[in-house]
Amino acid sequence: MSEPIQPTRPAASGCPMHGAQAESWHDAQMDFSKSMSYGDYLALDQILNAQHPRSPDHNEMLFIVQHQTTELWMKLMLHELRAARDCVRNDDLPPAFKMLARVSRIMDQLVQAWNVLATMTPPEYSAMRPHLGQSSGFQSYQYREIEFILGNKNAAMLQPHAHQPEHYAQVKAALETPSLYDEAIRYMARHGFAFDADCIERDWSRPVTYNASVEAAWLEVYRDPTHHWELYELAEKFVDLEDAFRQWRFRHVTTVERVIGFKRGTGGTEGVNYLRKMLDVVLFPELWKLRTDL
C-alpha cells in the first residue's frame, strides 16, 4: 500500500506579520536608498510635520488635521475648476464634464469630513479656542478663490489676504476673471444663443445675478436636450456641483452650531448667523429657476 499523502504545508505568505524574510515579500522592492520611495514622492515628512498645536489640549490635533486636509482637497478643486473653465473657454466641453464631476465628489468627501470634526464637544473646543487667536476658515484664500471662480464675487473679501501679497494677487485675479458660469454663457453666445450685451462683456468682479436672457437660452437647451446635448450635460454638471456645495455649506453650519452654538466666530463674524446667510447664495440662478418654468 502506498504511503498516505501528507498535506502540503502552505508556502510562507511573505507578510512580515508571519515572520517571512523582508526580501521575499512578493518580490517587492525593499531598498530605497537609491530610488524614490512612497514617502519621498508624497513629501510625507513635510506634510506630517506641518501640525503644530498651540495648546496642550489633545483635541487640537483633530482641528488642525481637519482643516489642513480640507485645504488639500480645495487645492484639487481649484486644479479641476480652472481646467474646466479653460475647456469651456476653448470650446471643448466634454473634458470639463469629468472635471466638474470630480469637484462634486470632492465636496461629497468634505461633507462627510464634518462628521469627524463633530466628534469634538463644546468643552473640548472651548479648551483650545483661546489659542486660535483671530485665525478662521473665513480667511482661507483657496476657499475664496473657489467662491470667485464659481461666480460668488465680492471685492471686500480681498482684504483678509492683503497681508500676503502672493495670495492677494491670486484671489484678486480670480475676482477679475470671468467665472466658470460666465465662460459658459460666452460659449453659448459664440454658438448662436442670444443674450443681453452685459452678459457677454461686463465688470467680471461683480457677482452673477439672474438675467432673463440667460434663462431663455438655457430653456432652449432643456427643451431640446438631444439637439444641445453637450450644453445640457454641462448645465446638469453645474447643478450637481451647486447641490454638493450647498450640502457642504449646510454641514458647516450644523457642525459649528453643534460645537460652539451662536458664539461669534474667531475671525469676528456672527458665526452661525453668518454661515446661514451664505446658504441663500445661488451660484447658477437661471438653472434653478428654469425647473419651475419648463
UniProtKB/Swiss-Prot annotation:
One Gene Ontology term from the biological process aspect of the record: L-tryptophan catabolic process to kynurenine
Catalytic activities: L-tryptophan + O2 = N-formyl-L-kynurenine
InterPro entries found in the cross-reference section: Trp/Indoleamine_2_3_dOase-like, Trp_2-3-dOase_bac, Trp_2_3_dOase
Broad EC category: oxidoreductase
Pathway: Amino-acid degradation; L-tryptophan degradation via kynurenine pathway; L-kynurenine from L-tryptophan: step 1/2
EC number(s) per entry: 1.13.11.11
Subunit structure: Homotetramer.
Known role: Heme-dependent dioxygenase that catalyzes the oxidative cleavage of the L-tryptophan (L-Trp) pyrrole ring and converts L-tryptophan to N-formyl-L-kynurenine. Catalyzes the oxidative cleavage of the indole moiety.
Similarity comment text for this entry: Belongs to the tryptophan 2,3-dioxygenase family.
Name of protein: Tryptophan 2,3-dioxygenase 1
Organism: Ralstonia nicotianae (strain ATCC BAA-1114 / GMI1000) (Ralstonia solanacearum)
Source lineage: Bacteria, Pseudomonadati, Pseudomonadota, Betaproteobacteria, Burkholderiales
